Amino acid sequence: MRVPLIDFLRFLVLILSLSGASVAADATVKQNFNKYETDSGHAHPPPIYGAPPSYTTPPPPIYSPPIYPPPIQKPPTYSPPIYPPPIQKPPTPTYSPPIYPPPIQKPPTPTYSPPIYPPPIQKPPTPTYSPPIYPPPIQKPPTPSYSPPVKPPPVQMPPTPTYSPPIKPPPVHKPPTPTYSPPIKPPVHKPPTPIYSPPIKPPPVHKPPTPIYSPPIKPPPVHKPPTPTYSPPVKPPPVHKPPTPIYSPPIKPPPVHKPPTPIYSPPVKPPPVQTPPTPIYSPPVKPPPVHKPPTPTYSPPVKSPPVQKPPTPTYSPPIKPPPVQKPPTPTYSPPIKPPPVKPPTPIYSPPVKPPPVHKPPTPIYSPPVKPPPVHKPPTPIYSPPVKPPPIQKPPTPTYSPPIKPPPLQKPPTPTYSPPIKLPPVKPPTPIYSPPVKPPPVHKPPTPIYSPPVKPPPVHKPPTPTYSPPIKPPPVKPPTPTYSPPVQPPPVQKPPTPTYSPPVKPPPIQKPPTPTYSPPIKPPPVKPPTPTYSPPIKPPPVHKPPTPTYSPPIKPPPIHKPPTPTYSPPIKPPPVHKPPTPTYSPPIKPPPVHKPPTPTYSPPIKPPPVHKPPTPTYSPPIKPPPVHKPPTPTYSPPIKPPPVHKPPTPTYSPPIKPPPVQKPPTPTYSPPVKPPPVQLPPTPTYSPPVKPPPVQVPPTPTYSPPVKPPPVQVPPTPTYSPPIKPPPVQVPPTPTTPSPPQGGYGTPPPYAYLSHPIDIRN
């Protein structure tokens, strides 16, 4: 026992001595360590091993507990023996080396340094928080939405987009009150109004003297679409181009300026409201157009002057400039495309079409016109303002004849027919859900450019159309129309001679009336109508060819389609009529544009179309015919001829005016019905436009109602189209798409026809 105790005591003494030494060393080491720390980096600290011993000291504490027991055992006696061993301490030094092994524990020190690093790590965590701040920047993306909001402002012109919808209801209310709350809309725009006061528009006020035309105010509803006013800014420059001194168009510039400043199409809208006064002009003009139909011969004489008229920059130039200008600034049209999304805007695109018609008067513009078609959808709003000017042209019957001459010129520039096609497509779109399609339409516009190439082929068809008019009637007997399409190319050979014939075509027009009697035959054809239903199937078959075929051949057919477009425009009106008389009016304006597309003989038709805008005038004469056209049947007859040959469409237009005047018009409707079956054939050309068919769905639903109401529509001033804007149709469009799919039992066939029609458009 003693030995162990002695040894134990010795061990304790050694530990104590070592611990004392280590404590001293530790203090020095700490001093040195701190010195190194402050002086340099961590390189020196590692060499300092003293530090580890300081840490190793903890192990000694472990032993210290045993030390306490020994004290207990330390009897005074034992202590003396212990001291002697201390003398032996020399040997103990050897143990000190063993102490070095504890330095192995140094690792604990390194661990401390790591802890230091962790703190830096912690700092990074704080930076991470700053990133959370970045997420707020992410919120900034919502701000980008602001730019869209700006577009809505155009739509909303009012403080909030919601207002724009409210505005649509107001249009509905407007119909109830011919007084036209629309004038009130200008008050809303009053902020911009200051600009307007400068505009000469007050003169338009003078034009308003005819309160009856207040229905023309309907255009104001149309103006609602002005929201796309982005394109309008483009028009402003056009207005400047129009600077053609005479034009009050300067007035238009004010509207244009307004859009630029607030970007608020609303300001433009006020002008649209004022523009309704301009619509008033259109009504007066329409009466002259009516006269024109009575005297087709007269229009031919005008043809010669027409060329001169183009020189007169005052009328056509001003109008054309706007259309041309639109092309000049296609860039805006892209922005407009968003507006196109806006259903309201699409409708107006048709209004633009009328300007294209004017463009034809001067072939030069025609190229620009193509861009306008694209732009037209973007900036349908201005087109309405332009329409009033076209209307003014109608006031001078001679002017409308100028349009006919332009048609002749158009053959020189086939491009028109292609551009027109594009517009036609747009018109249908506006009528229906198209609003959505309108964007697609815009896409087509770009493809349209490629069509321009086709237009050259188109040239031949356009020219044939003139002289062909006579031949076309024979073609009509051959309802097969399909082969006839081929014939149209032969017609193309005549094209050039046809120009001189233009005058003769008017005489031909008289025979055309007999040809209408053939339409009466079409009623007999009605028995075949069952067969026609198969013909409809053929159209599908034909369509397959068209995909490949259509590219080359279509150009000529395209011209034919232009004429078909007339009938399509009519159909759209019927469609609108069923939904509400108001709809038909809006559509009718598009028809007006479509007629412009046919520009050839159509020039006359466009005026009739204008009549629809003002139910008062048109009701007496064409409105009824128009209504009949609304009945898909009427337009179909035209389409078949167009399908057969482009010429047929041409003469058919001139004929149309007389039919309008003549009571025979009722007869048309019956014959027309068989044609509806034919319409499917016409669709064959249209297939390329198939995208629009979606729009057609809306028409199917409406079309059925149209037939019964057509008569009512003429009498009713329902044109008050103010409702039209409401129809604007976004709601209608959603509903209509489903109806077409649902396909009412009876309507489906007609709906199918409507699809092809839209395609042409």
From Swiss-Prot:
InterPro entries: Proline-rich_CW_protein (IPR051308). The keyword Glycoprotein does not apply. Residues 111-750 have a biased composition (Pro residues). It is found in: Secreted, Primary cell wall. Specifically expressed in endosperm during seed germination, at the site of radicle protrusion. GO terms for cellular component: extracellular region; primary cell wall. Keywords: Cell wall, Cell wall biogenesis/degradation, Repeat, Secreted, Signal. Residues 111-761 are annotated as: Disordered. This is Proline-rich extensin-like protein EPR1. It comes from Arabidopsis thaliana.
